[in-house]
Every structure is written in C-alpha cells, then in structure tokens.
Amino acid sequence: MISWFDFFWLLTYFLVLIGLAGYGFHRLMMVVLYVKHRKNVPQPKGQWEEWPMVTVQLPMFNEKYVVEGLLRKVTAIDYPKDKLEIQILDDSTDDTYELCQQQVEFYKQQGFDIKCLHRVDRTGYKAGALEAADMVAKGEFLLILDADFRPEPDILKVTMPYFTDEKVALVQTRWGHLNREKNMLTKLQSIFLDGHFALEQTVRNRSDRFFTFNGTAGVWRKCAIFDGGGWEHDTITEDMDLSYRVQMKGWNFVYLNDYVTPAELPEDMDGFKAQQHRWTKGCIQVCRKMLTTIWKAKIPLKAKLEATTHLTCNYSYLALVLLCVLIMPVCTGMVQPSEEWAWTELRMIVLTLTLFFFATLTVCGFYIAAEMIVKPRRWWRIFYLILPLLALGVGMAVNNAKAVLEGAFGKSCEFVRTPKFGESKEGQKSIEKRSQGYKAIKSILVPVLELCFGGFFLAIEITFLMCALNFNADSFGALWQFIFLLPFLGFFYTGLSSLCRIVEGMRSRSAKKA
C-alpha cells in the first residue's frame, strides 16, 4: 500500500511535469505557427506626403559610458531636422548629467532640436520619466531608445510608413546584439533573445495575437499611449503593461522581424541576473494586474490564451526549482515507489520521456528554429552551444523563481538598470574598471542556493558514475545522468559567477575604507 507521503509526492511531481510539458508544447506551437504565417509579412498601407513630427526619447540613468555613442547614432538618423526632436530623459545621480548638457550644447550648434530633461526625483523610474516627457514632447510619434541601443540611419524612414494606417499604435523592431561574440554568456543570451524576437514576437504579430513593446527600439503613436491610459508606475515592466492596455483599446501593433536595431548585452552574470530578475518580476506583476481584465475584454479567444501563456510562463522557473526539490526524496531513498504502481513503466513513459522531450528537445528545437530564421546560412554553428544554453536556463531558475515570488506577492523594489559599458579602446581592463561603477548583487542567498543545488546534482552524477563503473547502472542510467548534468553545470555556473562578483565587491569596498 502506497503511503500518503509517496502519494502526495507523486501527485505533485506529475503536476509539475504536466505544467512544464504544457509550456514546452507552447514552444512547439510557436514553431508550427511561424511556418504557417511566415509569409504574412506586414506591409505599410501607404507613404507620407509630408513626414510627421517625431520625438526621439532617450531614457537614461547614470549612463556616462554610452551617452556619446548613442547621440552620435541618433543625430545620424536620416530624417528632416525640422521634423525631429531629441529628448534626453536623464535621472542620473553621477556626472552623466553634466556630460549630457555638453552634448546638448554641441548638437544644438549643429541645428538639432535637442534638450535634456533632468529629474532629481526618480518617481516611477523609467515609466515616470517617459510620462513626464510625453507631456512636453512636440512629436506625434515617439521613438524610444535605451542608452545602449545604436539605431541605423534609416530607422524612421522604414518604420514611419506603417503609421499611415491610423489604427497602428506601435512599430517594434527586432533587437540585434553588438557584443554577441564577447564571451560565452553573451553568445547564450543572444540565442535566448533571438528565440523571443524571431519566433514569439513574429508569430504573435502575424497570427493576430497580442505582442508587447520591448521597452526600446520601437516607435509609438503618442495619442495611442494616452488612449491606453499612459505610462503607469505600478509594475517594473511598464512597456508590457501599456502594450496590453493599448491593444485592448483596439489599436494594432506591427513587428518588423527583418529590421534590426543593435544593442549591448550584459557581459557578466550580475548584469544578466539583474535584467532577468526585472523582466521576470515585472511580467508577474503585469499578470496580477491585467490577466483578469484580458479575459473580460472582448478580444479573440486565441489572443486571450496567448496572453495567458505569455504572462504566466515565468512560473515555469518556480516549477523547475520545485522539480529539483522533488527529485531529492527519490535520490535519497525517502520515496520508495511500490510495485503496485508499475513504477518501471511510469518512469519510462511519464517521467523520463516527458521530462526529456518537453523540457529539453522542445527547447532545442525552438532555439534552433529561431537561429535558422536569424542566420539562415550559419544557424548550424550554434549546435555546440545547445547544451550550455540548456544548462544556463536551468541555472537561472533560482534567481528567476525569487523574482516570480516577489512579483506574485507584491514586494516592491528599485528599478535596477542593466550595466552598459559601451565601446572601449582600452580593452577588457577598461570594461572591468567601468563595471565597478554599477552595483554588484549584495545578497548571498541566491548564489548559495544555486551552489547547494549544484552540489546535490554533483553528488547524483558521482553516484551514477560509481554505479556505471560497478556495472550496476540500469538501462535509464545514461539518460538520467545526462539530464542531471544540466542542472549541475547550470547551478554551479550561475552560483560561482555571482559569488566571485560578490567577493570582488567586498574586497573593493574594504580597499576603499582602508
């Protein structure tokens, strides 16, 4: 007779697997829908007889390393000067403001309508800065660019014709990656982002589902922002929040997968974790705020279902952590499944195949498909990155699960910006020096938990290895050993990377005090 502990363990385990399998199935659906809608490329309704007024908004906070490069690119945009306004939305507390003022004076002398809107109070963070700037912006349309983006000269000539359709509220371009080849972390991030942009955003737009503004590299119709209720401060992903509100008002969005606006990726684990934490927590905040409203809205069922999947997908990180915890009783012998439950067949059919296929192969297929879209002639070069990609995805589970819990239970936090280092002629030493100007992650809890999980899976790997050496491994041993290798590598990578940064920060602070 199975014990109550075993019963609840099995029930929870299967529910977690079903949840993860559901999100894995959604990835497969994205690939299928892309094939179905790949030819539905959006086309502009017409051309402007006279170019409309556009305001370029550049929100920044302590971005002194990238502001000059950004303004060089913005002032090189091919658009009539008398139809272009540039707003630097600066909330900086360092010497970025003085640098911005120098740049404003320089470009004013060249005939640009440029100004720096400086706030001492960071109320609402980026959303607050955009809200204040919209009130004084001259343009009917707003091109928003984060400080690390480098727009091409034709960005407005390409995007503006789509606004000849009066129902279009937003034109979003695809993110590119300036430092894709910098290190292993940037290579893996670029693949993650390519999956989101090349597949998810493209499919959502071309199949008449809702997609969201990515916070930058897009052009808004200003009146649509006001119609949707404007920028609100109650989430840290104000772009996602506004996107759903505007689309539920009946406005249309356009996503240009073939037009790329390049940007800088975080080059260290601290920056990557901070960015992922903000995106994950913000998505859960929007889920709490908007999901009920979305289901009450008079929009197609497929749009409601896709929005639900989009807003809840980050709960998979919590499920992944729970799965790692649930594995422990089996590996330590606390759960001893009985023969009555036909454990061998269940493990083969449900546990092994489901976990391996939906949590591994679907992810592989999803990102390979994305790279085939982004780099059709060189996509095969990412094969050696697939296993590190899977490992990093698992390794980020603790960091992102923490963000899910904070978002779900309403914990507020500071808007932590992503480190941006810009181009440096002095090489890596200069980058390391610049990184000291950004806050390191001080909390040791997440990296310690990551290392604990990594140590547990290391012990499992050693056990499997010993069994194999003694010829005691069963027929599934090799597959389980491969599956458990991913969390072992992922948790150690994320945990050690963060711990090293924390130690460096402690040493730096000690040296300053001395």
Give the role of each language-model region.
Residues 384, 411-434:
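Juxtamembrane inter-helical linkers in multi-pass membrane proteins
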Residues 29-83:
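N-terminal signal-anchor transmembrane helix
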Residues 92, 146-150, 234:
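The conserved acidic donor/metal-binding loop of glycosyltransferases
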Residues 234, 243-262:
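Catalytic donor-sugar/metal-binding loop of nucleotide-sugar-dependent glycosyltransferases
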Residues 104-141, 153-236, 247-248, 269-312:
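Long helical/loop segments within the catalytic core of UDP-sugar-dependent glycosyltransferases
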Residues 66, 296-320, 423-458:
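Loop-to-transmembrane boundary segments
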Residues 34-36, 44-48, 313-414, 446-514:
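Membrane-embedded multi-pass helical conduit in multi-pass membrane proteins
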Residues 72-118, 122:
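Acidic donor-binding segment of Leloir-type glycosyltransferases
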